Amino acid sequence: MKLTEEQVAQYKKDGFLIIRNFNTTEEIDIVRGEMKKLIDELDTPSTISIFTTSEQERKVDDYFLGSGDKIRYFFEKGSIEDGKLIVPKDMAFNKVGHALHDLNPKFEEFSYSQKIHDLIYSLGIYNKALSGIMYIFKNQKIGGEVDIHQDSTFLHTTPLTTHAIWFAFEDSTIENGCLRGLPGSHTEGITRRFITDPNSESGCSFIKLAEDKQYNKSDFVALECKKGDIILLDGSVVHYSEPNTSPNSRHAYTLHFIEGDNGVIYENDNWLQSAKPFRVL
């Protein structure tokens, strides 16, 4: 599915673009069913890694840092108490990452589809490499807030070439914590990077590139989606999501891609690394 000239212009203006009915219900149900199977078959791991974007609570462990070329499971903060699950297992996870697209055949077929190739190609990115793939649960009642951020802070290239496709696997509404984006914010660059840091107790740290900006949440646009819609996101666009306190989950899938050629450098101090080069779509 190729973007029209009008869609490309809108994306370049806002830094995000909603595309309706990109995936069929059947396509989504296949990979959602596969994720259910993976969760059902998973023994509760001895390593419990809780994922949060709160800088006050962010903890980076070896399990997380080693997930770039593996399938690993990260728990929601509100699902664990004294090292034990306090919610049903299928509601306990924040996300699964970061190599589903390469290690699971169902997700591989979904992620490397021709229509995704055509979509990215129409942006003028011809040699695209996939990285940082996540299945996001945002489960009912306990789905955590995702703080205001820019994806290129975490997946940095020189020059900046990171983009993301956010797939709505369920309806995404204001009530269950839809994405919210700040139009035009991608034109101002990024203010910091998240890097591996052997001198940091956690193994990672932020480095400042420019003065942090103060944002008013009322300036952000709610990017509500129906199941099957996608959101295209520039890696520099500022976005976030509220916690999900509703009775409805908000499953989604995020696929990041970068320019894989033309002298573009994927920084070797990015937190997400793979033993093999990122596979080109």
Curated annotation (Swiss-Prot):
For the keyword Iron, the answer is yes
One of its Pfam families is: PhyH
Q: Which GO terms describe its molecular function?
A: dioxygenase activity; metal ion binding
For this UniProt record, the keywords arranged alphabetically read as follows: Dioxygenase, Iron, Metal-binding, Oxidoreductase
Q: SUPFAM superfamilies recorded for this chain?
A: Clavaminate synthase-like
Its EC number(s): 1.-.-.-
Binding annotation for Fe cation: H149, D151, H239
What cofactor is this protein dependent on? Fe cation
The protein's matches in InterPro entries, at most eight in alphabetical order, are given as: Phytyl_CoA_dOase-like (IPR008775)
Top EC class, one word = oxidoreductase
Amino-acid positions noted as binding 2-oxoglutarate in the UniProt annotation, renumbered to this chain: K95, M134, H149, Q150, D151, W166, S241, R250
Question: PANTHER family annotated for this entry?
Answer: PHYTANOYL-COA DIOXYGENASE DOMAIN CONTAINING 1 (PTHR20883), PHYTANOYL-COA DIOXYGENASE DOMAIN-CONTAINING PROTEIN 1 (PTHR20883:SF15)
Q: What does this protein do?
A: Has alpha-ketoglutarate-dependent dioxygenase activity. Does not show detectable activity towards fatty acid CoA thioesters. Is not expected to be active with phytanoyl CoA.
For this chain, the family text in UniProt reads: Belongs to the PhyH family. PHYHD1 subfamily.
Protein name, as recorded: Phytanoyl-CoA dioxygenase domain-containing protein 1 homolog
Q: Which organism is it from?
A: Dictyostelium discoideum
